[in-house]
Amino acid sequence: MSPLGREIWLETARRALIEEGTAGVEINKLAKRLGSSRGGFYWFFKDRAQLLDELLELWADTSTVLFERVLHNHHEDGLKEYLAMTNLWVDEEEYDPKWDGAIRDWARTSEVVRKVVEVVDQKRIAVLEEIFRHIGYQGKEANVRARVMYYHQVGYYAMGVRESQSERRALIPYYKRALTGRD
């Protein structure tokens, strides 16, 4: 039996994807990172394709749950939900922009991954739209505000903007006013 667990292989593959893209998610490379043999990999995965499928599923499940949890934790208080979502992005503790970016990079070369990203993006935008409805916006206005917020944040990371957490936190009230229309 392999002394390394399935989660360790998945986490190592996740880090490899972030650092090297899909080319880094090769069985030999992962085994070397872990100081294991190829055989250790096959205790848990049929092949590389299964590992990649599970990585994509892990991203889709965990990243969507982070957004949905904001709604459940703040009981339809839109401004609290907005700030919780902003903190989720700014803190970069639970939400990992590098992980998100690695999946988006992969989606540029895989139609299957692109479709999963599209579904996740729609779910995330739906959560943001719900937040804006809780603030008091309806219909297209709630949707557009949600899209602007989401596209802004995804673009922030895609552009590689470099600001300290304190710089980002200092801007939160201004973004809040611009995006929610509230102080």
Describe the role of every protein-language-model region.
Residues 64, 95-101, 109-136, 140, ...:
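Amphipathic alpha-helical packing segments from all-alpha helical-bundle domains
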Residues 114, 118, 133-183:
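Hydrophobic/aromatic-rich alpha-helical bundle segments in the mid-to-C-terminal region
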Residues 54, 68-98, 149:
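Hydrophobic alpha-helical connector segments
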Residues 18, 22, 64, 68, ...:
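Short amphipathic alpha-helical interface segments enriched in basic and hydrophobic/aromatic residues
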Residues 45, 91, 103-109:
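Short helix-capping/turn signature of helix-turn-helix
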Residues 57-64:
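Short, basic, alpha-helical segments at the C-terminal edge of helix-turn-helix-like DNA-binding modules
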Residues 8, 12-54:
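Helix-turn-helix
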Residues 1-4, 183:
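N-terminal intrinsically disordered/low-complexity leader segments
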